[in-house]
Amino acid sequence: MTNFWNRRRLRHRYVFDMVPTISVNASQGAGFPAAAEEISEHTKVSPHVYSGAMAVIFDPLRGRVRPDASHSDAEIVDVLTETYSDADWAVLTGAGMSTDSGVPDYRGPDSPPRNPMTIQTFHSHPDQRARYWARSWMGWPRMRGTRPNRAHLALAELPVAGIITQNVDGLHQSAAEAVAAERGNDSGAPAPSPVIDLHGSLDRVICLQNGHLFDRDLVQRRLSELNPDFAEEVGIDPIDVETAPDGDVELEDTAGFIVPDCPECGGLLKPDVVYFGDSVPAARVQQANRIADEAAGIVVLGSSLAVLSGLRFVRTAAKEGKPVVIVTDGPTRGDELADYRSISRVADFVTTWARR
């Protein structure tokens, strides 16, 4: 055993929600952070076949058209800061928050095809599991080097009620650290807003047998030890690659890639992100619900609300008569519920908000 396996785990275990699983069909692909609970009436999944390893996703936004802006950004910001205060708002963020950091989204013009892996496949198909880990190992150095953009930094300056993110890149936390460092010992500065990684985070790895968490860098090191010549064999420099939204890299041949087991129980290791058919930890759901329930309204930044994990917060707010603000330059599934709709770039809007 190397020193990697002697490192202390991050936390003891998770308690998981019970969420119905799904059967799916496809051939190849990478992990996608979406749980079975997010499959809506508009998301179709093909029947299970023995060789099928991935989910085929039909975009629930197909046919939707981006609405016009309901108000100017200045008018919306007046509502956020004068009719209410910053602390009244829960903020839900999606992939559009991170595109300016170089993290691609799922629906942009240059987005890769979406053939996401399911948790069932990860459990039962060793070849697909190794394929996933090879792609993830290759993409992690680039993803790890991603830095928060001005949207993250501006939002980190705002004392909002809390941030619920569907992203798995950890950039909200990085932005909070950068803002705190810039403020130094300013005793009058507001405390950082809580951040809930609804779909998990790529910087952690979880054992599917005992729930223990490990630091991703340590797992990355172990993967490198087990596969010292892999990058050279496939002819790709891990530092100079284009990653998919989940931080992995397209690879044609992953045969022979070796994946370590959990050092404590021999179980399967998986990045701590939620796959199709997987379930969101109950404690995480409760934390997100608490933020949304206690807020006076919700601001959606850079999310198409294509999956129910995000859309349900908007639906609940609208049902309770709370104001809904949506900011993104494309259509969303919540547009008809929005009281205030901006079609500006997320970074431009949040910067305007932070300056008021």
Q: For each of these PLM feature ranges, what is it?
A:
Residues 14, 23, 27, 35-356:
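Conserved catalytic core of sirtuin-type NAD+-dependent deacylases
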Residues 7, 34-35:
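Extended intrinsically disordered, low-complexity segments enriched in serine/proline/acidic residues
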Residues 1-16:
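Extreme N-terminal basic, low-complexity initiation segments
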